[in-house]
C-alpha cells in the first residue's frame, strides 16, 4: 500500500510492480495535499537521465524525472542501455518490452506536470500517473501489474474517472480498480 503523499510514491510503485507484486495506492486528498507545489515555469534542461537496464534503474530514472519536474526542469533521457523489445528476460521470463513504454511514461508525466503549474497535482492526475506506471510493467505484451486506487467519496473527478468513453482519452485508467475510502458509514443517498 502506498499513499501518494511524496514524489517518491511514483517510483516506489514502479519498483514494487516490477518485482511482481500488486500495489494498492491512495490518492485521497489528505495524502495528495502533502505533495509539493509544481513549479510555475518549465524549461528544457541539459541534464540527461541515463536509464539502467534493471528494475532499480527504471525506478531511479522515474524518481529523477519527477524530482526535476517539481523544480521546473525538463530533462533529456538516454535509454541506450535498455534491452531492445523482444530480448529474452532470464530472471522474470518472457520478453523485454524495450524502452518505448518508459519513454511514453516520461512524456505522459511531463504533460501532467505541465498541466499543474503553480499548484499541487490533483488526485486524478496522481491516479493517472500511477496507472501509467502500471502500464509500463508489461513484459512481452503481457500485463504484469495489478493496481487498486483509493480516493475520497466526495472526489467527483475520481468518481467519474471511468465514466463515458474514458478509454479513448485515458486508456491508462484500465490498469487500476478504483474504490473509495471513508471513515464512517456513508448515507445511502451518497450512492444514488
Regions found by a protein language model. Give the residues of each.
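Extended catalytic cores of very large enzyme megasubunits
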Residues: 1-192
